[in-house]
Amino acid sequence: MAKSNYYGLILAGGRGTRFWPRSRKHSAKQVLNIGVGETTLIQETVNRLAPIIPPERIWILTNEFVRDEIVRQLPNVPARQIIAEPAQRNTAPAIGLAAHILESVDPDAIFGVFPSDHIIGNPKRFLSLVRAAFRAAEKDQIAVLGVAPRWPETGYGYIEFPKGTTEGKLETVPVKKFREKPELKEAKKFVRAGHFYWNAGMFFWRAATILDGLRLHLPKTATLLSSLPPFGHKDFAARVAKVFPLCENISIDYAVLQRADNVVGVACDDFGWNDVGSWHAVYELLPRDSNRNASRSELLSRKSSGNYVDCGNKIVALLGVKDLIIVDTPDAILVADRGRAQQVGDIVKLLEEQRRHELI
């Protein structure tokens, strides 16, 4: 049963540079259909949450370049609740702004924070875990979802739970410590230990609770945000444009979670979470032929294996190549070693250095 004071905050300000050349400033990863499912990633995120949080209680923070496209894709989310941040200031100011807004709209607001561009393979199980986190937030706790690690990943932060924590129970336990992204050797130790979980970037709290946390641990930003008028005030947008860029550029993890003493976590079993962080991740999610090729285009392949192809309506012929990413758009083509998928963002940096703004 959905509660009327449950809200969802979707963070949708990322650029998705590792998905170049599909992901661009005005068509970032979160508004793309990457071939997994029938809708775009942000549409899927909103649809997934609907049994607990209907669209009218969804709020989205994004950037000025992609806001209009998000409004177009999500007609059931009130347009005034899709807000473009005036500057990039990481997750602590963004969440603080959302908490200020929600507390002015509903003093009893409890909200979950969700990335806009992740895949969830088992939505039903996911919602059960989300409900458990919301129940903890009702008790003025800060709740996080920890995902049971499936391999020793070095690209995620980890959450340390008490030894003996059992995954999959729909209850929360105190979080011992947040760990930074580890080296491979340490990541292997985390997985073997059995009580370290991936930090999936999903958090739950009362608006009042996280505002208290910001006042205690990030007072400069909290003071700036508290100077804003209530949401809906005629000067609200102008004041946000002036105040928000002055906030500290820091994540909510560093600003509050690592310092707070009221953080609990749900030690989640496998609900099919995937942050879809690169073209390689898409390759892993899609069906593959007998030679391990995955393609969104018509494919002719000979003596070729392990390739990912996304070239629209074109027929793509592969001959004697392996483990490539091939992505074709009207003005750019990416050909990359699939093992270097995490480095595709470096191409965007190179284009920025060359001032090829039309390509980013």
Residue ranges and their predicted role:
Residues 1-10, 18-25, 35-127, 131, ...:
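Conserved N-terminal catalytic core of the sugar/cofactor nucleotidyltransferase
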Residues 2-5, 207-360:
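Left-handed beta-helix
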Residues 123-244, 264, 338:
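Conserved core of the sugar-phosphate nucleotidyltransferase
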Residues 42, 98, 117, 159, ...:
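Residue-level signal for inorganic ion chemistry
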Residues 3-7, 55-56, 78-79, 106-109, ...:
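Short coil/turn connectors at secondary-structure junctions
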Residues 10-12, 61, 112-115, 144-148, ...:
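Short beta-strand segments
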